[in-house]
């Protein structure tokens, strides 16, 4: 007999006053949608990124207002980085990959000693499958820097821990890297190094 709980992880970014929260949420959703849909071959310039956004609008994959919420400079900086180049040249990249896995309760809660499983569902922003393991990447659109960014990393660690467990369960392969990329700050944080 086992007890099942469902946790659904979403990564909306909330910060600031109510109006700012609404704008931050919209920016986060639109940016994630854009990163999940864009053609990696269209990431070489601001102009090509804007054209790609317009193409996705024409295909009704993005709302007509979406491009005004995308910071194309930040997206270009990401795809010009070593990680961006690695993603563009990878053999297998999964984007916006949904997951639904059962995870042992004792892996999620320190004080639990049982065989109960917890159903966890969510969506990976990006999975990079490579010979030496899996890289889990989570994009963040938070407008934070310095000490606030360090605190935000700590806030997101539990989410990435769940993603780590879910990816290993789902793909039956070791997670070699858990990455958070803060688009606004242009900063990559590796929470798990092999």
Q: How should these model regions be labeled?
A:
Residues 1-194:
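Structural signature of nuclease core domains in nucleic-acid processing machines
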